[in-house]
């Protein structure tokens, strides 16, 4: 098993800390935030429509905490960390693409409302990079 390579430290630390922080913020999110996040996700993923918003936010937060921690742990291989990040960010990119208000009509370029979510594309790129450099 291969472990963390020094050349991957900057991307793993920056991305891991960012995702971990986002998860911790969501973990303590209020009902208003839960409704907003749930509504966006349920629009792209209909299977979430029947899930209570607060439960959805808590599960999303737990996922972010797990992925962020995985990236930060030095004994987790690049392949495993990359797989976790690719799966997680791939789901976010899919949501971005399925939500018309987030990107310009007929384009993948973000609208002002979509800029915050469009950053998930670079996380997908980092995840794929970790997968090809195990």
Positions of predicted regions on the chain:
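Membrane-interface extramembranous regions
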Residues: 1-66, 73-134
């Amino acid at each position: 098993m291969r472990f963390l390579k020094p050349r991957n430290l900057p991307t793993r630390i920056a991305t891991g800390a960012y995702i971990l922080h986002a998860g911790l913020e969501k973990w303590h999110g209020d009902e208003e935030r839960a409704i907003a996040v749930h509504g966006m996700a349920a629009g792209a993923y209909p299977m979430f429509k029947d899930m209570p918003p607060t439960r959805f936010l808590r599960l999303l937060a737990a996922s972010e905490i797990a992925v962020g921690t995985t990236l930060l742990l030095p004994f987790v291989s690049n392949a495993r960390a990359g797989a976790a990040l690719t799966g997680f960010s791939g789901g976010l990119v899919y949501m971005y693409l399925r939500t018309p208000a987030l990107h310009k009509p007929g384009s993948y370029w973000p609208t002002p409302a979509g800029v915050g979510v469009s950053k998930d594309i670079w996380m997908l790129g980092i995840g794929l990079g970790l997968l090809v450099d195990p």
